[in-house]
């Protein structure tokens, strides 16, 4: 009897990766009825619903999320084995990466040309946004995350420490002066995060040996880190900015560091997170190693 399990895994993965039955059929050079029939057979065989279907989108069930992790592990191992016996030890296939907008643009994107040049059979799909993505629902292999990690189901590798500093443009200071103490920030226009990153509006300081927090308040807020940084550069307000953006701008004279003697750093870091598969594919493992090596000595900490 023909064993169709591997084919069903491949079709299921294609539906998830291409976000739908029609797109999966196109990618597989097959038909939409074949894809639908294969998924129905798979669900009957497993005795579980894997995909919620409606007219607008498809969403994995909890069972579907677990099965996808298994499919990725098995199919990734198969790809690695085929490459090995073909005399090709280099990774191949799609690599889906997510990163915050500013950090991804400023730090991850410049690393990709060398990575791709030395691994020509890998195709990188890079998604940049400040929202926390669900790796399974968004079909992401590796996500770069800044700050504390909250999803204990994911595995993580620390890339480097993450610190933020309070800054303002020289033009802002010329008009409004520099706050001499954290308490004085109440009289200043502080740029605010909106949405999933609103916790960053609580700025920590150390005053007379005790930790205090200032809640940022001002006339501009955004869910986008690059837009906040852009308004800070243009003299709109004061911002608590990640060092990868702030330190180079300070050295160039575009920003001025404020309240340095009161800084109280959070115990936070930048991590590469990935699904808890027992065996990572070669391309995912190599990319995480590549990031870890690149950020072992953070490039923004070095003098220009």
Regions found by a protein language model. Give the residues of each.
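C-terminal effector-binding regulatory domain of bacterial HTH transcription factors
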Residues: 1-2, 69, 121, 247-248, ...
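Hydrophobic two-helix hairpin corresponding to the core of helix-turn-helix DNA-binding domains
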Residues: 9-12, 24-25, 61
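Short helix-boundary/capping micro-motifs
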Residues: 14-29
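Conserved amphipathic alpha-helical core elements
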Residues: 42-43, 255
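A short LG(V/I)-centered, amphipathic sequence patch enriched
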Residues: 43-60
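Short helix-loop hinge/linker segments at domain boundaries
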Residues: 55-58, 65, 76-98
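Central regulatory/effector-binding core of bacterial HTH transcription factors
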Residues: 92-155
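C-terminal regulatory
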Residues: 149-270, 297-304
